[in-house]
Amino acid sequence: MHDHLFYTASVHRDNPGALVVQESFSFPRLYLALGVTTMRTTGSNEPYADLYLQRHIEDGRVVGPHINVTAPYLEGAGTQFAQMHELKDANEAREFVDFWANEGAGSFKAYMHVTRAELGAAIAEAHKRRVTLTGHLCSVTFREAAELGIDDLEHGFIVATDFTPDKQPDVCPPGGTQKYFLQVDAHSAPFQDLIRFLISHHVAITSTLPVFELSAPGRPAPASMTRGLDTLADFARLNYLTLRAASHSNPNNHGAEALKKEMELERAFAAAGGMLLAGPDPTGSGGVVAGFGDLREVELLVEAGFSSAEAIHIATSNGAQFLGLLDRIGTLAPGKNADLVLIHGDPSKDIAEIEKVETVFKDGVGYDSAKLIESVRGQVGIR
């Protein structure tokens, strides 16, 4: 539910005009190879490439999962990404949604600098077109977004600005949120009030723990992530290792604490009855790779306190329900799509065995996981 078709890792990624690389060749194969048979892109930098890929997969000309293509980001003024359009006002936000819905986008995503007026207009137009809108927000708080009718919030509470004192309307706090996020008590009245508010407004939360694990020093490298790195082009691996070394050597790095806190808060949200979704977010410093990251997300949900069955349910059935596709996918039942994964092991006893994927069936057709992975070795970061 947070599966991009681009790769961001570069030591130059913060430079003005930096571009992200479209991965229309390698990522669809990797997603399918590791058991992802339906995905949502959750933000596009090359929307026509994503729509083209979607058509070719459905026509059987390209190997990959079924794709819910999310439109380009609904971003306000101040973005750092050259491939993102900056909205001018609420009217343009409505026109943006209308245009991309006509082009074939199946969902929308608001981004960090969007204003409340722009977000509200976009949500209203998206719902008029019967599609969902999610957000990775900063300038708008989670509570404000819920009041406006948003369907889903990405990354969990680690990006929420609700707990940042002196937060100014429609402005992303200049000092970031981590300091205040680490102080949030899952049992406190303010947090419990927020999650009750989100649940009452039917707002889902998408967990993306793997991308935050990248910033947590001292953790052993999981097999899924190590295997993912083997698919990187040489320059992409060098970029990742350089960024990782810089992050982990930073004396002000609180990534391990932040990961643990996010796990705790997501568990509290789900325990209160909230709908938790799952995705890897293959961005950041580049260590989260398509497919491998999806498996790692399930493992991290188990580390957060969910049972293996609960974690798998979050990653499958909950996602299908959110997409409105539970009558076709998300569980195994007569009449549903023949989408299933054959694993050499028992993840219900040891969740790490979820990585031992041998064959993936999509629409009844079996794909050899190892061969798909081998077909893109050394290609991630290039195409």
Regions found by a protein language model. Give the residues of each.
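Surface-exposed amphipathic alpha-helices with a cationic face
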Residues: 54-58, 119-130, 199, 267-270
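Divalent metal-binding pocket/active-site signature
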Residues: 106-154, 209-214, 258-260
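Metal-associated gating/positioning segment near the N- to mid-region
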Residues: 1-61, 80, 85, 91, ...
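Acidic, glycine-enriched loop/beta-strand segments at the rims
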Residues: 289, 307-312, 321-357
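Active-site gating/metal-coordination segments in enzymes
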Residues: 72, 77-129, 172-177, 182-185
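Divalent metal-coordination and catalytic microenvironments
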Residues: 35, 67, 104, 126, ...
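Divalent metal-dependent hydrolysis catalytic cores, especially in the metallo-beta-lactamase
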Residues: 26-48, 65-72, 102-114, 132-134, ...
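Active-site neighborhoods of metal-dependent hydrolases
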Residues: 99-109, 114, 159-304, 377, ...
